[in-house]
Amino acid sequence: MKMRDSKGFTLIELLIVVAIIGIIAAIAVPGLLRARMAGNEASAIGSLRAINSAESTFSSSCGANGYAVSLEDLSKAPTGSTQGFISPDLATNGVIKSGYEVNVSSDTSAATITAASKTYNGASAAAVSSYFAEAHPVNVGSTGQRSFGTDTRGTIYFDNTGTAVAAGMSGASVLQ
């Protein structure tokens, strides 16, 4: 019998390496998913802050102290400008951004301030006395866990169930 000089790894050594990689992956993947959800939630909060800012600017410059009732109206540029009040990635109600659906509407107690034809950006709906915006995860537990809402006051609220926050913020808590 002739002995050969073997070079390389044995099957056992390779299996041990694969098992170690599997254990590391099992530990790391849930943390990465939680980090992704936290990032999506931070993006949703940022979107609501951008909406608050856009609504404030719309009200003071274009809506005769009234607020827009849709993202479409916020995305329209005022007379003499080429840019709307909100970034193009938030240009329509129901837009999906970072795993969250974002919407703007009039608040439940909103009254008409000025007709749509009287706004300076050709809004499709009348400017109203108060607005409501919400962002909820498309897939609760996967793209995000909490839902968020805000209104004319500018305070952001959250709900841990992931269901869309209702106008009036019933059942929601103030985000610290």
Language-model features: locations:
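Extracellular/periplasmic head regions of type IV pilus-like filament subunits
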Residues: S53-R146, T150-R153, N160, S170-Q176
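Alpha-helical segments that scaffold the active site and NAD(P)H-binding pocket
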Residues: A25, N52-S53
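N-terminal single-pass transmembrane signal-anchor helix
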Residues: R4-L32
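Aliphatic-rich helix starts adjacent to a transmembrane/signal segment
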Residues: G31-L48
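A short local loop/turn or secondary-structure capping micro-motif enriched for an aromatic residue
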Residues: V165-M169
